[in-house]
């Protein structure tokens, strides 16, 4: 029988008297108990992985193959589909068994993490330094903190490499730009040119430039992950082998709450970037799985009505609309031929179903007359009625002319949730950064519990 590190499983060291924090402060009570804090983190990871596995199985159980993913309120299966599992040409789901396997693997993993969390929270050593010096730490030990940063960076780089390996050697990934409407393909020639990869970072975030969100091919996405993996792993090794420079020792606040604030800022930034990526990008987030982007749905409506009226005999190249501009086609500010009407504001939209109809100077009139394929018509008609707002238009941010019923786009859900979560994470960063700086400066005040206003208020009854 194993000898317990703690002879008692009582909550000593976790009450207000011994830690200075009440129960509602959560893990703040464990600031100086590295073993118990490890248990809290491992258990938290178990909860996250459990949700992932359970929700994946829930989506598999409710999945209807005849309907597109974005019409079924799915947010996990679309991510698995982008990795090339269970899908074929055009994004058609041909096998849900891989999704079932992923869900079960996550459930099993969550059980292991859950037991690990309980072990470290109840049975394991309260302080790691005494029993396992390598895993122990002191918040003010700058060298140990940068070593921990290095380990995290190596893990992040390894995660980026996993996507690279899947795309290049283990079956490929789904590419919405594959000819004929998208397909799973192996990315055998990723972009490694640093000029191409790092030019995304220097792009303007406004208009058609779109910063890193403008990436529109899988070669650049996988090449970017190769560069990220290289930078993260090299950076991780650097931080493990070196000590912080003197300027970093002076400039940064070295405390547990400071590290929490740094982490929250990083997560907030990721949330804001993910928000933009999900909303605008249809390469990393293919419209076959996540639904069309707003501009894409608007262009799809113009295209659908152009196809209809052209079959009815309209001369789409010269027909005028009520404003005197082209009804179906017009010129962009840079002289390209674009769709007319209200969708003119989205003239620089790029979509796999539309690009084959472009020529050297925008939309090619000859291709529009003779080369439109049935799959393009079907996809545009589907996207037209599945705009991420539930509508093609909005006035002052309020959706108007609703043209879909009982529909919430995964694109709307994911972008909104990531923005909201990113916002609150940023507020958390400001809060904890302020507290950490105040504590470091020696002027942290906190709340005066003895003179709280609530103590002088009348009872509710």
Swiss-Prot record:
- What is the topology of this protein in the membrane according to its UniProt annotation? Multi-pass membrane protein
Recall the GO molecular function terms of this protein's record.
chlorophyll binding; electron transporter, transferring electrons within the cyclic electron transport pathway of photosynthesis activity; metal ion binding
Q: Which domain of life is it from?
A: Eukaryota
Q: Where can this protein be found?
A: Plastid, Cyanelle thylakoid membrane
List the propeptide residues: 1-2
| Principal cellular location given in the protein's record | plastid
Residue(s) carrying N-acetylthreonine? 3
Modification Phosphothreonine occurs at = 3
Give the binding site residues for [CaMn4O5] cluster. Answer: 355
Keywords, A to Z, come to: Acetylation, Chlorophyll, Chromophore, Cyanelle, Manganese, Membrane, Metal-binding, Phosphoprotein, Photosynthesis, Photosystem II, Plastid, Thylakoid, Transmembrane, Transmembrane helix
GO cellular component labels:
cyanelle thylakoid membrane; photosystem II
Instruction: Please give the HAMAP family that the UniProt record associates with this protein.
Output: PSII_PsbC_CP43
Name the family.
Belongs to the PsbB/PsbC family. PsbC subfamily.
Q: What is this protein called?
A: Photosystem II CP43 reaction center protein
What is the originating organism of this protein?
A: Cyanophora paradoxa
């Amino acid at each position: 029988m194993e000898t317990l590190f703690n002879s008692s499983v009582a909550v000593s060291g976790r009450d207000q008297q011994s830690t200075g924090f009440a129960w509602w402060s959560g893990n703040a009570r464990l600031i100086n108990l590295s073993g118990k804090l490890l248990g809290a983190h491992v258990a938290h990871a178990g909860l996250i992985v459990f949700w992932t596995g359970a929700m994946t199985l829930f989506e598999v159980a409710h999945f209807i193959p005849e309907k597109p993913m974005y019409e079924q309120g799915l947010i996990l299966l679309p991510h698995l589909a982008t990795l090339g599992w269970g899908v074929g040409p055009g994004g058609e789901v041909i096998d849900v068994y891989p999704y079932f396997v992923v869900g079960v693997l996550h459930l099993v993993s969550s059980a292991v993490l859950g037991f690990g969390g309980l072990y470290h929270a109840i049975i394991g050593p309260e302080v790691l330094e005494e029993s396992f010096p390598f895993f122990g730490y002191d918040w003010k030990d700058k060298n140990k903190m940068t070593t921990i940063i290095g380990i995290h960076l190596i893990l992040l780089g390894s995660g980026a490499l996993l996507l690279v390996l899947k795309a290049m050697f283990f079956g490929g990934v789904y590419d919405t730009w594959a000819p004929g409407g998208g397909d799973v393909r192996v990315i055998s020639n990723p972009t490694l040119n640093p000029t191409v990869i790092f030019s995304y970072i220097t792009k303007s975030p406004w208009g058609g430039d779109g910063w890193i969100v403008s990436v529109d091919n899988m070669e650049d996405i996988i090449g970017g992950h190769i560069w990220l993996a290289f930078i993260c792993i090299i950076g991780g090794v650097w931080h493990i082998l070196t000590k912080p420079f003197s300027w970093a020792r002076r400039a940064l606040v070295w405390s547990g709450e400071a590290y929490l604030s740094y982490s929250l800022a990083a997560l907030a930034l990721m949330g804001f970037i993910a928000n933009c990526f999900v909303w605008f990008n249809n390469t990393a987030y293919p419209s076959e799985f996540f639904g069309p982007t707003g501009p894409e749905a608007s262009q799809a409506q113009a295209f659908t009505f152009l196809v209809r009226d052209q079959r009815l005999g309209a001369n789409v190249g010269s027909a005028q609309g009520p404003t005197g501009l082209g009804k179906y086609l017009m010129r962009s500010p840079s002289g390209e031929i674009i769709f007319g009407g209200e969708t003119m504001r989205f003239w620089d939209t790029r979509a796999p179903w539309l690009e084959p109809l472009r020529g050297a100077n925008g939309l090619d009139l000859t291709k529009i007359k003779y080369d439109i394929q049935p799959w393009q018509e079907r996809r545009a008609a589907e996207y037209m009625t599945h705009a991420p707002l539930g509508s093609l238009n909005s006035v002052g941010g309020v959706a108007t002319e609703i043209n879909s019923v009982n529909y919430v786009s995964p694109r709307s859900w994911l972008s909104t949730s990531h923005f909201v979560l990113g916002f609150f994470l940023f507020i958390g960063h400001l809060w904890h950064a302020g507290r950490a700086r105040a504590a470091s400066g020696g002027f942290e005040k906190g709340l005066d519990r003895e003179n709280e206003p609530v103590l002088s208020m009348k009872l509710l009854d």
